[in-house]
Amino acid sequence: MKTSIFKSLYFQVLAAITIGILLGHFYPQLGEQMKPLGDGFVKLIKMIIAPVIFCTVVTGIAGMESMKSVGRTGAAALLYFEVVSTIALIIGLVVVNVVQPGVGMNIDPSTLDASAVAVYTQQASQQGLIPFLMDVIPASVVGAFASGNILQVLLFAVMFGFALHRLGPKGKVIFDVIESFSKVIFGVINMIMKLAPLGAFGAMAFTIGKYGVGTLVQLGQLILCFYLTCILFVFLVLGSIAKATGFSIFKFIRYIREELLIVLGTSSSESVLPRMLEKMEKVGCKKSVVGLVIPTGYSFNLDGTSIYLTMAAVFIAQATNSHMDIWHQITLLVVLLLSSKGAAGVTGSGFIVLAATLSAVGHLPVAGLALILGIDRFMSEARALTNLIGNGVATIVVAKYCRELDEKKLDAELSGNNKNDNAATPTAQS
């Protein structure tokens, strides 16, 4: 029994994170030098994301009996994303107004160094709905795969899947090739995941070594407030949605515990995207639903990021004594409903969206971003964890609504009745 515990990815990642924290704290310079380990692991995962999405979506759509169900799944997913993201934005707004973490700081915006956030404000000026929609269309198919743009790959995969489905029996050879290729890709993922403890160790050692635990103290109230809000959202909002759908949020979190630890170590929810595709199929969701909901959710269903955006914007207003009445906050909410979709998939998207929002609202100082630039790294874990749980719950909800969920399989997997619960599966049945 002990041997199986020590060999489990869950234990190995947890141990790696602990060792990384200790190394970063006691030997900060050495901890900073561990950064390539974390970066390397995330790059390996990103290398495989595009082919995983392509294979999953194409085989899922091409293997469906009716194309009507694809449109129904997409519409249900987008409606769910918008409703739950709005709830996340509102919860962040309510909590930051009640706790008021920025009140009393009395920061003069003119004294802030805006040069540190100039790169984000410059990118923010280029964001918008039309540029975002145009960016979904790749200049070339090869370019979409080379850049790793999730939405571009998803668009091509959906079109390819539809075309393959229309070929009928003539397309079976291509379908079989892609399905076989999918098995190979998931085999590669299994190899990469063995390096997860090393990646988590390197990323955590670097974070603690560079920023130190002491940096959390100065703006600790905002960090604590944000973490508690994310916990509140997961267990109250997502927990209620899960209960209404017929499963326990606690059992689901236990089911994806390894993925959560990897995200905690790397601060990147993308690091477990391929593995989540596997696990959501294994839990009973049909491949076509998983292939559409998970990749799309990584751009449109960022619950943790939504909470962060409203809290950060109002915190800056409080810290700089910028007046925000109820109408200003409603305006902020409306702007965020649009802008939060505009920088999806962009590196540093949280800051870019926040900069764009502050500029759009007008009366909030964009230079105020400098206040949270230093602690943003410590809030990224909560954002990524909440985003991951939110996308997992969304997949099950949409699958059940579209009658593409095996509820007996869901109950068995979440209850741990399947002994191979955490084993990687090369492919899932559609």
Swiss-Prot record:
It is a multi-pass membrane protein. One of its GO terms (biological process) is L-aspartate transmembrane transport. One of its GO terms (molecular function) is malate:proton symporter activity. It is found in: Cell inner membrane. It comes from the Bacteria. InterPro entries: C4_dicarb_transport, Na-dicarboxylate_symporter, Na-dicarboxylate_symporter_CS, Na:dicarbo_symporter_sf. Keywords: Cell inner membrane, Cell membrane, Membrane, Symport, Transmembrane, Transmembrane helix, Transport. Its main location: membrane. Signal peptide: none annotated. The chain crosses the membrane at residues 8-28, 44-64, 76-96, 144-164, 184-204, 222-242, 289-309, 326-346, 352-372. Responsible for the transport of dicarboxylates such as succinate, fumarate, and malate from the periplasm across the membrane. This is C4-dicarboxylate transport protein. It comes from Pectobacterium atrosepticum (strain SCRI 1043 / ATCC BAA-672) (Erwinia carotovora subsp. atroseptica).
